[in-house]
Amino acid sequence: MKSKKNLILIGMMGSGKSTIGSLISKELNVKFIDIDSVLEDVTKMKIVEIFEKKGENFFRNLEEKITLKLLNSTNNVISLGGGGFINEKIRNEVLKNNFSFWLNCDTQMLLNRIKNRKKRPIAFNLSDSELTELIAKRTKIYSKAQFKINCHKLTKTEIVKKILKIYGHN
């Protein structure tokens, strides 16, 4: 890994952050940190259980605390949860000291990937139109990332290559 800065992946649930992050970390031979997985390890609960048993406020507070701590590490590939970058403190820290990549996916692709997925607590009870509205709202914030990767019609390998090419020049 050329830089000591973290490579951060942001985007909607279902955009492929965990999959792409894992592949990039293997290519760069660095640690991969999936924030949602860390939250599950810390709470000993699945994300959907945290939402059901503790509520969204508890989840967001814990997500902020853990994410900010992990963003102070270096030389990692980190996948934020879908709502992580929406948090202003997290977003500011990501933009200040890291390389951020937004995995921008076609709305219909995202709808197909996340529809009726029980492990996606925010999306589970939303209609297609409500999900589309959520995607549009988050897109405005995701667009603040340093780099935008349009993932539509790209394979996982092509996405990884695009990110590594950009990352290698910084």
What are these regions (language model features)?
Residues 9:
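Hydrophobic anchor at the beta1->P-loop junction of P-loop NTPases
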Residues 97-140:
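A glycine- and Lys/Arg-enriched "phosphate-lid" helix/loop adjacent to the NTP-binding pocket
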